[in-house]
Amino acid sequence: MLEIRNVSKSYQNKKVLHSLHIKLSHGIYALLGPNGAGKSTLMNILCNQLTYEEGEVLYNGQAIGALKKEYYRRLGYAPQQQGLYDEFSGERFLTYMALLKDIDKKRIPQEVERVAALVNMQPHLKQRCATYSGGMKQRLLVAQALLGEPEILLFDEPTAGLDPKERVSLRHVFEALKEQHTLLIATHVVSDVETIADEVVFLKQGHLIAQGGVGELLLRHPGIDSLEKLYLKIFQEEQKE
């Protein structure tokens, strides 16, 4: 469905992504790496918000730059630390985002109810965003990404700042979405994705280090029995370099 084919990106002559080749189909993909690994850069490229020097990004075999509106209709994105309009109610925020996505005005009330139900936010839609907890705000951002029934969902550090209960709640939301969507979740918190990811992608200083299912990756590293231990091994080695 979505293919990142030999993509490289530089900032001021410093390469931050190195010939990445990643294929995504249905299910949950975890993009793991510390700050500075290139996760947010890759997310911005997938949203067609950032140019790159080499390679291409394909959606169903076609370059995303050529598809334009068709690709955007298939894409839902919740960026890291997106601000909410505190004076808006949750309902008004989702309505505003639906208008930005060119959803038919007659369909918007029904669409707002649909996405709110998916993230268990219906009881709170009339409240102002300023009154929401961190977890509620994050669920609202997930809801706006679901507007228009996109096939591909991108989440950049979706659990940042959430308490353990809110993290678990959001994981349940992601699990419920994976049958009908492709999810790419960028995070440095391994516990957020270890039990739900169908595949894991490790990024290290802009390089693709490994990709595969959790069990498959552990088999490649005898003596390592958890994704968290594998993460620590990879990035402790990075600190020594």
List PLM regions with ranges:
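Helix-to-loop junction immediately C-terminal to a conserved catalytic motif
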Residues: 47
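Conserved ABC transporter NBD signature motif
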Residues: 55-66, 70-71
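Conserved ABC ATPase signature
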Residues: 87, 128-132
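Conserved ABC ATPase "signature" region
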Residues: 95, 99, 106-124
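Catalytic Walker B motif of ABC-type/P-loop ATPase nucleotide-binding domains
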Residues: 153-157
